[in-house]
Amino acid sequence: MTDPWIKRDGLWFDAPKLVSPPPFLVGHWTAGEGGSDRVHRVLVQRGLSVHFVGESSGSMVQMADLDRRCAHAGSRGNVGIGVEMVSAGLPPKPPKASTRSKVATTCHGRDMTALAFTPAQEAAFVALAEALASRFGWPRQVPDTDRVLTPGEISRWRGALEHLHLTARKIDAGMLLCGALVRAGWKPVSPR
């Protein structure tokens, strides 16, 4: 059997087709402040890919076709549209500093401090999520919880979620992207 994943320009553009339509958007943070060029290099080095990268400026860079499966969230999440938002995510340790404001949030039932996305990033993410929801017929909903969803909950989910909802090993995007969508009118819904 031949490998269906073919590397082109460093990303897996000829990946298998997604289920039609993709069931959800998966929000991530990059864990670094570099732009889409740096994100591209890191993804290639790690054998990963995403559909979009959200720059600090608010620009959204499309990295893969929407009908292709990208390797961004393990087997459960890779059926969704992956969106990496440029941010270190967590405040740097001294003596380093960040120009981003800090925000209190929770992840997997624990309090944490994360770095806020820029207002332009939040606006771009919301606009992209709205466009994807319209295109794929998703309800405008996010999980009302910061816990890992069960496999059954993931298989039934439609709308947006974050990487932290798919595995206990990840904390991105700290419920910040779900929060931005709720402020824009999306509904927090129980995944049960």
Q: What residues fall within each predicted segment?
A:
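N-terminal catalytic cores of peptidoglycan-degrading enzymes
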Residues: 1-77
